[in-house]
């Protein structure tokens, strides 16, 4: 039997990350900057200038004849036509992959129109496809929201799993004085975290290993999914990180309806088995008793006194998802939020090109931003959100 040297060991699953359009391309650049290893990066865009500035390993100019390299003009149908024109190039770039991430910022032209075409080609090749899409801010206007709704509905039909990230919820996690361009930069970075949180479960060597087969078992034909990341340090870091992961303000619906859960605990040399067990108990208690649960533990020596927990929840039935989303929309559509949106819209030029916002601001870490627990009502501060939602749903059933 031949000897396998450490330098010869590589990830056997081929993972490709495709950034489609401006926001998707920015997410790819951030992943490259973050040193995400074991994956191949592809940027696809109708905008030739944006592609020129991309750090991706492979760059594909979509629809040369359709757009002339000048972009899709915020029209998803132009993005769709451009992707169909370049279908053979897309297919060649995706060949050989076991898993493909399609990342888009829904609402624009290229990402919204071309994203689902890329996913469709990948599925035709028998590849496991995960879509990660951000929803636009309310202040970006009704037209962009309609574009996003159409894009997400199309993407959902052509992926195994779809993770949607609502940009409006970023407003719960950042300072109100944060400049507009920096807010878009933060939104782009959420895409990076969505992809990195899943891919590292496969590419990073673990103390308790997860592999591609584990991820595929949870994410194949899974439909809508939730992702949460929690970070904590100190005496109660395991419970705090687990709670943050399942109650992140970026999670649109409760985790308790999940039929499949994949989570990973990452820590330094001081991480203990009892901490892994503590985190596992919190996460498993939040989901269906019949849920298929797979977990791993990864050692990162550079993490001193800190635990990071990544949770991927899938297998929600559509009725549950729609019901809970309706509750969330009603909770966020307050007169105050409506008034704030009107004020912002009146001062915003929505012809803004924010794809290069990363170059304008410092590359400070925003990782902790997504792991803060959602604000609770004062009289229910000790009751986790998922338990309140479960109690509410059970009450409706009894009635």
State each model region's role.
Residues 1-399:
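Tubulin/FtsZ superfamily GTPase core signature
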